[in-house]
Amino acid sequence: MEEFKGYLQKGGFKQQHFLYPLLFQEYIYVLAHDHGLNVNASTFNEPSEISGYDNKSSLLLVKRLITRIYQQNSLIHSVNDSNQNIFVGHNKNFYYQMISEGFAIVVEIPFSLRLVSSFKEKKEIPKSQNLRSIHSIFPFLEDKFAHLNYVSDILIPYPVHLEILVQILQCWIQDVPSLHLLRFLFHQYHNGNNCITPKKSSYGFSKDNPRLYRFLYNSYVVEYESIFVFLRKSSSYLRSTSFGTLLERTYFYGKMKNIGVTHSNNFQKTLWLFKDPFMHYVRYQGKSIMASKGTHLLMKKWKSYFVNLWQCHFHFWSQPSRIHINQFSHFSFYFLGYLSSVPRNRSSVTTQMLENSFLIETVTKKFETMVSIIPMIGSLSKAKFCNLSGNPISKPVWADLSDLDIIDRFGRICRNLSHYYSGSSKKQSLYRIKYILRLSCARTLARKHKSTVRAFLQRLGSEFLEEFFMEEEKVLSLILPRTSYPLHKLYRAPIWYLDIIRINDLVNNL
């Protein structure tokens, strides 16, 4: 049982005493329990050398804002200089927004310090920038997924009750005042809607406080994935105890004693039912993929585990339809802008031995990635580059720019998409996207000069098209001539780049 203690034992870096007792003192408790504060829209001056370069990162500013809300109606400021009083005209909601931004900055400090200290412990900092690339996951999928049988397409569910988020943070934060402040911010922004949802109320929260919202969402995902890893490692024990009680980690060691009694008798019986060494899990944003070499029954058991996990630990009902189990040979899943699949390719070889001939059939599986053209056309349509049918249209909002700026903007978008979709196994969809952007650029320029597209293209010549080629494509076109079949095949092979740290906006909107 020692390996389980290693998992659930709280690490020293997770138990943080933040700066709130020193910074905010008793004000947080008052704020968390007094929701009837009525503050006039007053402001104060703070020198730029104190407030910082953007007037948003100053802890002193946050403390003064809390003091101002707490001492309601005690200070009345007259506005004499609008340049000095930069906060004039803001109401109480502005104070709460500034406080939440300061909260997000302070709560990230221990994690940043831990990252720096981990680098200082090592003499040489590992070159991990390549692992940060989004494309770095696809070589892993190519190597592993071709040998697996089933895949589960999982949408990480929501909403999450706000009190559950506070309980999750209790594992990391020991400051009671900071938790009071967090509860107060939740109540202020959601006005009684105690869930993080995709509705308008949560949208305003994530839009006004993106830093705090990302921190809370990542905390929820870390908790969910840490329990998943625990279930994965201890899957052979789950048969011997109640699944729901195993999720609650408060009295875990006491429960493990009960598991140890039945463990010796049931271990050999349950190990083969649950142990799966060929299981892989990847996630990006709110979507995750779990693939296994096991049977369909095993994947259904994991689906049941996930549903019970969200219901028992996070206290909300998750629809089982959010987890789709499919066989790799009959399913294509959409992940990171690519439509991925593992098709079976059959090939027949005739062999002859003496007077007898034999027909040997072989089945090979290969991980393939393609550009899903229909969602991509929908994204281009929302950006006003084409209509819903995929026909290029002009972009009037850019017609007032200079010709070089228009060509540069279209060319940059085209090159970025080509760069991101360079790993596609089939390039036809990528060529169509390039065609839409090129013709949309030509229509925009023709609209600006009140000319026809044909006349404008004849005047620009071939230089217009060169702006839409990537530098890598220019080099490959010189080194690998398309007339040679082997080189042509190499030219069309997937290329993964290790310098892409974010998804293109057009791809991310799919």
UniProtKB/Swiss-Prot annotation:
GO terms for molecular function: RNA binding. It comes from Spirodela polyrhiza. It is found in: Plastid, Chloroplast. Usually encoded in the trnK tRNA gene intron. Probably assists in splicing its own and other chloroplast group II introns. The gene is matK. The keyword Transmembrane helix does not apply. This is Maturase K. Belongs to the intron maturase 2 family. MatK subfamily. One of its GO terms (biological process) is RNA splicing. The keyword Plastid applies. Pfam families: Intron_maturas2, MatK_N. Keywords: Chloroplast, mRNA processing, Plastid, RNA-binding, tRNA processing. One of its GO terms (cellular component) is chloroplast. Its main location: plastid. It comes from the Eukaryota.
